[in-house]
């Protein structure tokens, strides 16, 4: 079967070979898609995103269950809504140094994801970005980040200004400077067996520990 090709941005071309390897080349912004609506479908096994691409369009790789790892280049500034939603086989993702925003449900349902490092440029992590990622073992934030932190290597993402823990994982140790646990912070964290909530926490938002079974 010959490789398939098309456009996925005004100046971006996609090519899919017969082994399921997708390559995106070009510059500028990607098109947005509906859930599972991207032209390459859900059967891709790898994706290579070239330097020069500035964002990853909505739902671009949603429910691509065979993807196991992704490297997002340093030219990318935005990961939009639902980009990797439902990619259950995704284990590792490298988020490029220029990414400033991670959209809603961007990695929601990535049940195989093991670790996430938030780079220094990230200013916005939207709701449910890492919802239902039950296998996460490691969550860290670059020490130069001005908005989020993972103080004391706590294995969590904390909104610095409000001392709100927004995402945790099975290895999280909640620091005694955290005052609030955000909505869905540990939702579907099925590997979680126990957690100590320090006295500093005065507010636990709805759904913080939903479906931790």
Regions found by a protein language model. Give the residues of each.
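Consensus positions within tandem repeat domains that build extended binding/scaffold surfaces
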Residues: 57-60, 80-85, 103-106, 127-129, ...
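Structural signature of tandem-repeat unit edges
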Residues: 17-28, 42-55, 65-78, 88-101, ...
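Short intrinsically disordered, low-complexity coil segments enriched in acidic
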Residues: 1-3, 210-213
